[in-house]
Design a protein with these regions (language model features):
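C-terminal catalytic/substrate-binding lobe primarily of soluble NAD(P)-dependent oxidoreductases
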Residues: 1-104
Length: 104
């Protein structure tokens, strides 16, 4: 019942202007067990819950439909990034998303 009060009703949500003005920026730092360090940056313009997610879903579908020969044949249950790898990353970059990894 708490979520019903917090979440928008079906058909409600941010205006087109708010969806366009939205964005997300993530920065992560990781260290391997051997001590190597990495920085990761992921960014996209557009509301993350509406516009950016729609781009990710659309590009994932196109990747599955059009890039299938470069994807694993069988591997069990995978995340989109594991299943589609660099093919999906390149599609998302072409759609305006940023994905960068650098060693520290």
């Amino acid at each position: 019942k708490v979520l019903d009060r917090l979440l928008p009703d079906p058909g409600e949500g941010p205006s087109a202007e708010k969806r366009e003005k939205g964005f997300f920026r993530m920065r992560n730092r990781a260290k391997t067990s051997s001590g190597r360090g990495f920085n990761c940056r992921v960014e996209a313009d557009g509301d993350p819950g509406y516009k950016a997610t729609a781009v990710m879903l659309g590009e994932s579908g196109l990747c599955l439909a059009l890039d299938g020969s470069g994807l694993p044949d069988a591997a069990g249950v995978l995340t989109p990034a594991t299943a589609m790898g660099e093919s999906l990353t390149e599609r998302l970059r072409a759609a305006g998303h940023t994905y960068e990894v650098s060693e520290v």
